[in-house]
Structures are given as structure tokens and as C-alpha cells.
């Protein structure tokens, strides 16, 4: 097996000087190491609690390329298991979601309870006359499963920091989506899934760090939908709220720490000029007082923003899109997109959120297609030997990082910077090159201390 020292990880990433070698997006050995040391050691989003409300409810997803099933237990707790029969490695759960009393392998009929225990083996007395220790052959359980305000995460590594410590200061930014109203959030509708022919790090980096692209990649949408905001509840494109926020915002910042990233504008209006139908904008205006009381002015107004929890959980404030970038190969990622809304919103508002999220950021969304085209074209170019071994510039905002004194936490910069991208690649390199989580944490702390000198 190729080792981290063979790959010279830190020769491919130079975050202190803002350099990245695009071989990191194409190398199959790097990809295999990512599956082991990133997706095998980091906290990964599994599901929202609203998707499995009752005992026996399950949801099938992935941790890296490993299929897992998340199940609500009889006592209300949540477990996750490798979706693999212990007999011949067959998948035991095929439906995307549902409710069940047991998971039965279609190959030889081995059956497992929702707690993962092997409960039935067909023809057991005749097939195993010597006896079979069924307690030894239950489903492989994900050892670490925790929830944060409705979001369920899993981790294979018992030595990893707890979920809240892992999130760190990104939790403050995440709360701006999860904690706007009493009752929290829920997933509306199903999951939209599609494949993009690019490396998973392209979308993760963009959602962590890149507001810069919107001025150019989404220029056509800005031109078509950039009408003045008249404060009405008109539908998108009919003179309401699509004016680009960078034209009206008072200020903006980017957060980048521990591999996570976020960026947002300081806006003046509760609807924040986001790419949504007027019904959604009206909802934000009507619920602003509650959000401000719970979150404070900055986060209550923070509806135009991009975010990524390392490695692959992204969301956009305002447009209600939550998505996971499931890696499929060095040059392919599968997108799973959810619509997340306040649970207290009316059914009509939830439907408007879902329509707006799909229109802008669904697989055929007028903004999503701009992004996908960029990532796919880059991946095509990186088939070239010189292209994938050149150096790329990651210097935007280099040396301008600061910690604020107004209660906004973490390492920050102006929104048009690459602080979060540099931090993401530093955490990426630290994970790939370290044998233990403590080593990772020490390296990341040293990097962040150097950044803030």
C-alpha cells in the first residue's frame, strides 16, 4: 500500500504560502488514503432526526464509499451499521428509507434485528450442526453516533474528538440555520441525488471558501433575476428579492478554522436578497423578531452565506439547501441534496422553500449547473500530466486573518479570501499524514497559531 511518506503530502500542499498541486484531485493512491484517514476518522453527516422519527425507521446513506444504515431504536436512541451481511458481504437494506422490524439479506436469508443482532439463520441446525455463535456475527456497528440539534453524525474512530469539540466554532455559524425558531428544523421532501464528474474536494472547498466565483460564474442569473427588491411577496423573477447581496451588504466575512469554512454578508433586511420565492422572503421578514431574539441580529440577518463542515457537509443559508458530497472515485462525486426548513413553518412556506431550493440548487438548478460545469471542466483538464502537476494560487487574503472582538468567533478574513480553503487543505494534509487524532490536532493548532502571528 502507498504510504503518506511515499505521497509527500506536504509537498502537494503549502498553506503558509498559498500553493496547491492539483494532483490531489486525481491521484488514486491519495483517494484511497482519503477513504481510510478522512472518511474513516472524521465525523460524517448521516441523516436528520426528522427522517427517522419512530422506532424501526431507517435511512440508508454512505460514509465515504461504505454503505451504512441509520436506524431509530425501540428506546428512541439512534444506531448506525455497515450495510453488509456478515455471511457473504451482501447488502441487507435496499430501500432508501422506511420502517422495518428486521433487515434480511436477500442472498442467503440471514436476518438482523434493528439493533444489529443476528436473529435468524435459515436451516441453522442442519447448516451449522457444530453450532453458530450468532452473537458474534451481528452487523458491524458504527461505534460513534451523535446528534447536534437534529443532525445525526457518525464516526468510525473511537479516538476522535467528540462531535461538539470536532465542530468547534463552526457550530456558531451552523446554529444560524438550525436554531432560528422554537422546535428546530426538519427535512422536507425526499433526497435529490445526482453524480458530478469531479473530485469531492472541489465542491467542498467552494462551499467552505468561495464567494468570489458568484460574481462571474453566476453572472447570467444575476442579470436575469437582479431586479430591485420592492419588499413584496412576488414570485422569483417578478421584481422581488434576487438583487445580488454584494451590492447592498454593509460588510462581509469569511470564517476558516479546523478545516471548516463559512462566509456571509452583513445585511440590513430580514429577507437578505436571497434567491428564493417571495413567499420565503415574506416568511423571513415575519419571523425575524423571533430569530433575532434567539440568535442576535447578525445571525438573524445572515441568510446569504456559504458553509462546509469538513469534509463534506455543506449548506446555504436562506435557500434551505443542505447537501453531502459522497466520494465515488478520484474524479466523481455523488451529491445528495436535502431541503431543510424550520419545523414551525407552515406547509405552504415549506413547499415554497422546497421549490426555491430545487429551482436554484437542484440537479437542474440555474445556479447549480454553473458550478457543476466549472468543476467538470477542471477535472477534464487535470487528465493532462502538466496540468495536474502545476502549482495553483491559493493566496487570496493571505496574512490578513484576524480574530474579531464583536462576538463572531474563530479565525476570520474578508469574504473574498481563501482563508477557509487554506485551512481545509491544511486539515486534509494533517489527517492524511498523521497516525493519530492527537497528532492531527497538534499539527492543526500549530498551523493556526502561525496563521494568527
Curated annotation (Swiss-Prot):
One of its GO terms (biological process) is 3-phenylpropionate catabolic process. GO terms for molecular function: 2 iron, 2 sulfur cluster binding; 3-phenylpropionate dioxygenase activity; iron ion binding. Binds 1 Fe cation. Keywords: 2Fe-2S, Aromatic hydrocarbons catabolism, Dioxygenase, Iron, Iron-sulfur, Metal-binding, NAD, Oxidoreductase. It catalyses: 3-phenylpropanoate + NADH + O2 + H(+) = 3-(cis-5,6-dihydroxycyclohexa-1,3-dien-1-yl)propanoate + NAD(+); (E)-cinnamate + NADH + O2 + H(+) = (2E)-3-(cis-5,6-dihydroxycyclohexa-1,3-dien-1-yl)prop-2-enoate + NAD(+). It comes from the Bacteria. Its EC number is 1.14.12.19. Its cofactor is Fe cation; [2Fe-2S] cluster. It is an enzyme of class 1 (oxidoreductase). [2Fe-2S] cluster binds at residues 85, 87, 105, 108. The keyword Iron applies. Fe cation binds at residues 213, 218. This dioxygenase system consists of four proteins: the two subunits of the hydroxylase component (HcaE and HcaF), a ferredoxin (HcaC) and a ferredoxin reductase (HcaD). Part of the multicomponent 3-phenylpropionate dioxygenase. Converts 3-phenylpropionic acid (PP) and cinnamic acid (CI) into 3-phenylpropionate-dihydrodiol (PP-dihydrodiol) and cinnamic acid-dihydrodiol (CI-dihydrodiol), respectively. This is 3-phenylpropionate/cinnamic acid dioxygenase subunit alpha. It comes from Escherichia coli O9:H4 (strain HS).
Amino acid at each position: 500500500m502507498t504510504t503518506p511518506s511515499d505521497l509527500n503530502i506536504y509537498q502537494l500542499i503549502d498553506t503558509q504560502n498559498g500553493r496547491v498541486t492539483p494532483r490531489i484531485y486525481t491521484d488514486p493512491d491519495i483517494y484511497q488514503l482519503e477513504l481510510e484517514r478522512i472518511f474513516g476518522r472524521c465525523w460524517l453527516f448521516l441523516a436528520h432526526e426528522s427522517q427517522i422519527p419512530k422506532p424501526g425507521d431507517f435511512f440508508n446513506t454512505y460514509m465515504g464509499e461504505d454503505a451504512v444504515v441509520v436506524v431509530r431504536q425501540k428506546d428512541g436512541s439512534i444506531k448506525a451499521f455497515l450495510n453488509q451481511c456478515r455471511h457473504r458481504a451482501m447488502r441487507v437494506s435496499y430501500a432508501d428509507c422506511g420502517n422495518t422490524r428486521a433487515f434480511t439479506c436477500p442472498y442467503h436469508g440471514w436476518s438482523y434485528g434493528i439493533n444489529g443482532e443476528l436473529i435468524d439463520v435459515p436451516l441453522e441446525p442442519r447448516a451449522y450442526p457444530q453450532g453458530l455463535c450468532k452473537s458474534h456475527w451481528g452487523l458491524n456497528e458504527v461505534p460513534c453516533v451523535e446528534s447536534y440539534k437534529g443532525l445525526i453524525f457518525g464516526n468510525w474512530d473511537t479516538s476522535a474528538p467528540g462531535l461538539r469539540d470536532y465542530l468547534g466554532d463552526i457550530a456558531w455559524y451552523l446554529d444560524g440555520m438550525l436554531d432560528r425558531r422554537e422546535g428546530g428544523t426538519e427535512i422536507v421532501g425526499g433526497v435529490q441525488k445526482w453524480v458530478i464528474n469531479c473530485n469531492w474536494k472541489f465542491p467542498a472547498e467552494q462551499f467552505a471558501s468561495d464567494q468570489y466565483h458568484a460574481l462571474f460564474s453566476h453572472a447570467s442569473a444575476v442579470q436575469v433575476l437582479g431586479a430591485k427588491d420592492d419588499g413584496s411577496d412576488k414570485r422569483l423573477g417578478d421584481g422581488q428579492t434576487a438583487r445580488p447581496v454584494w451590492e447592498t451588504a454593509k460588510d462581509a466575512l469569511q470564517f476558516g478554522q479546523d478545516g471548516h469554512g463559512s462566509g456571509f454578508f452583513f445585511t440590513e433586511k430580514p429577507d437578505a436578497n436571497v434567491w428564493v420565492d417571495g413567499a420565503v422572503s415574506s416568511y423571513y421578514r415575519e419571523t425575524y423578531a423571533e430569530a433575532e431574539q434567539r440568535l442576535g441580529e447578525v445571525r438573524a440577518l445572515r441568510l446569504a452565506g456559504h458553509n462546509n463542515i469538513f469534509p463534506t457537509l455543506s449548506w446555504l443559508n436562506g435557500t434551505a439547501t443542505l447537501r453531502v458530497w459522497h466520494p465515488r472515485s478520484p474524479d466523481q462525486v455523488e451529491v445528495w441534496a436535502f431541503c431543510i426548513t424550520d419545523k414551525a413553518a407552515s406547509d405552504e412556506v415549506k413547499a415554497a422553500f422546497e421549490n426555491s431550493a430545487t429551482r436554484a440548487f437542484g440537479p437542474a438548478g440555474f445556479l447549480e449547473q454553473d458550478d457543476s460545469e466549472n468543476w467538470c471542466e477542471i477535472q477534464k483538464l487535470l487528465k493532462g500530466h502538466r496540468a495536474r502537476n502545476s502549482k495553483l494560487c491559493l493566496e487570496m487574503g493571505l496574512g490578513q486573518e484576524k480574530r474579531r472582538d464583536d462576538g463572531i468567533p474563530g479565525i476570520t478574513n474578508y469574504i473574498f479570501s481563501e482563508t477557509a480553503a487554506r485551512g481545509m487543505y491544511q486539515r486534509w494534509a494533517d489527517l492524511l499524514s498523521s497516525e493519530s487524532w492527537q497528532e492531527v490536532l497538534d499539527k492543526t493548532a500549530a498551523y493556526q497559531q502561525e496563521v494568527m502571528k
